[in-house]
């Protein structure tokens, strides 16, 4: 049984509250019964909140585990009295770089909003066997889609120069060469195929001294970005979203590190048909950060699709 009666056609809220949820919803300026694309569905927290505000939602996620959450949401919609859940909610397993094709095939040609919550989800971090978390032991995998080369494959096959370049470019790691040399030396002794072994190799290579966070954090970020081509996918998704949006529609993006945020900032600036809604990105308040430490790094940028000028070709 559900706690509290669900309003007709509105499913119950998710137990896990996403980062900066209310600010995301406000920035999307939801118009009831218009379509919004939740391009990073995850466990469905944003989608449930969007449905509760009256939006219709096309949800996309490449993570194979997301489909079970989508099915649970469909079941909740039926319980809440929606005879045909596809009128309110559609889920497509796909990479958000394929947003244009997905939206066309799903019958959502000009959505009123697109939401991207970037990076690795708490759902992925909480499962040690996915290989995303340096604090949880598991196979060194890191694939969001479950297909293609793993992080263990990269760590096994790349030479020191390639590893150092990835750590420097995608992890913004100051000690990239030192860590890369340590990885090459360690793998000659025994395979680096678990998260705990990689984390220990990086920790041992790191210079002594006070640290704000775990020494392996930037290395794991860099490998995850390479494994999933995250920045290439983001650029593709931003272009597709801006092309798709109806005039007056909103594009809202949550980024968690400077590489992502820079790409979003430049995408908004470089498109004549996008108007940024804030001069600087919005950040989570102290209370939210205290309740959810992941919110500390979040930066929210939002833009509105402008109508074409009259007389424009």
Locate the predicted segments by residue.
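S-adenosyl-L-methionine-dependent methyltransferase catalytic core, i.e., the SAM/SAH-binding region
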Residues: 1-313
């Amino acid at each position: 049984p559900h706690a509290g009666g669900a309003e007709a056609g509105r499913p119950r809220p998710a137990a896990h509250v996403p980062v900066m949820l209310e600010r995301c919803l406000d920035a999307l300026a939801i118009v009831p019964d218009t379509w919004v694309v939740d391009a990073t569905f995850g466990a469905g927290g944003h989608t449930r909140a969007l449905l509760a505000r009256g939006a219709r939602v096309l949800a996309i996620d490449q993570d194979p585990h997301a489909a079970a959450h989508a099915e649970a949401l469909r079941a909740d919609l039926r319980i809440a009295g929606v005879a045909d859940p596809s009128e309110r909610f559609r889920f497509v397993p796909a990479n958000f770089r394929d947003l244009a094709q997905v939206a066309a095939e799903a019958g959502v040609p000009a959505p009123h909003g697109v939401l991207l919550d970037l990076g690795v989800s708490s759902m992925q971090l909480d499962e040690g066997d996915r290989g995303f978390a340096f604090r949880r032991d598991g196979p060194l995998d890191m694939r969001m889609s479950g297909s293609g080369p793993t992080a263990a494959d990269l760590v096994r096959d790349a030479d020191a120069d390639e590893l150092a370049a990835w750590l420097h470019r995608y992890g913004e790691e100051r000690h990239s060469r030192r860590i890369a040399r340590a990885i090459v030396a360690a793998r000659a002794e025994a395979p680096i195929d678990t998260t705990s072994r990689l984390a220990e190799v990086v920790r041992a290579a790191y210079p002594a001294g006070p640290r704000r966070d775990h020494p392996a954090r930037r290395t794991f970020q860099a490998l995850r970005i390479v494994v999933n081509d995250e920045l290439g996918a983001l650029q593709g998704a931003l272009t597709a979203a801006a092309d798709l949006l109806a005039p007056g529609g909103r594009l809202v993006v949550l980024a968690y590190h400077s590489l992502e945020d820079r790409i979003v900032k430049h995408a908004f600036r470089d498109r004549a048909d996008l108007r940024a809604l804030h001069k600087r990105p919005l950040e989570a308040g102290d209370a939210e950060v205290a309740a959810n430490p992941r919110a500390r790094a979040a930066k929210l940028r939002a833009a509105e699709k402008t109508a074409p000028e009259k007389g424009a070709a």
